[in-house]
A protein has these predicted regions:
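N-terminal, positively charged/glycine-rich alpha-helical extensions of SAM-dependent methyltransferases
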Residues: 1-15
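Class I SAM-dependent methyltransferase Rossmann-like catalytic core
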Residues: 13-24
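Conserved alpha-helix/loop element of class I SAM-dependent methyltransferases that forms part
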Residues: 24-44
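A short acidic, Gly/Pro-enriched loop at the edge of an enzyme's catalytic core
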Residues: 103-112
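Residues lining the SAM
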Residues: 114-115, 143
């Protein structure tokens, strides 16, 4: 699809430790609201696509018997494995594969979450596969946050200019394509809601 935004492969290579340490967590109220809406059985599966270091998988794990934490970056899934071992979270399965290449049977998941990553995926393909992976009555949640660094305040504008200047100096300004932060409100021709349920 010509209008799709493409990200450089390996964009997060080597960043897992920093991502785990500095990535802001999702608010507890959001996690609780998501669990309330999806009303998991406690016996089902959660799929966290493009999971990073498990910012959604870990806080949601208590509502599921099994959690698949999937990310294309090996460093991210290594951190997930280490965190799961340290927490004694045997139900968390870290899988190193892209969302587009994941092989999962139909109707396997009660809830699928994608946190701050749907814009980086091949959206129509992933949306189609997600629909098949959800069990009847299952839910898809596209979780999003805004950057605390972006905004109209003087310090935010100054930081933005500084980051852009360093991107130019380091030759990385083209790694993130323009428009990545405006994913739109549709997937193909399907409107996106806050939380979608498979009927």
């Amino acid at each position: 699809m010509a209008s799709e935004v493409r990200f450089e492969p390996g964009l997060y290579r080597g960043a897992a430790g920093y991502y785990e340490r500095f990535r802001l967590p999702y608010p507890g109220a959001m996690i609780a609201d998501l669990a309330r809406r999806a009303a998991p059985s406690g016996h089902g599966r959660l799929l966290d696509l493009a999971c990073g270091t498990g910012q959604l998988a870990f806080p949601l794990r208590g509502w599921f018997a099994e959690v698949w934490a999937v990310d294309a970056e090996p460093g991210m899934t290594e951190v997930v494995r280490a965190k799961a071992a340290a927490a004694g979270a045997a139900g968390i399965r870290a899988v190193t594969v892209s969302a587009e290449d994941l092989r999962a049977g139909p109707g396997r998941f009660e809830l699928i979450v994608i946190g701050n990553a749907f814009h980086r995926l091949r959206r129509p393909l992933v949306a189609e596969r997600v629909r098949g992976w959800l069990e009847p009555g299952g839910w898809l949640a596209l979780c999003w946050s805004t950057s605390p660094w972006a905004g109209p305040r003087d310090w935010q504008q100054t930081l933005d200019r500084l980051l852009r200047r360093w991107q130019d100096v380091l030759g990385t300004s083209g790694r993130v394509p323009p428009g990545w932060d405006r994913p739109g409100r549709t997937v193909g021709a399907v409107p996106v809601r806050d939380v979608a349920r498979r009927r």
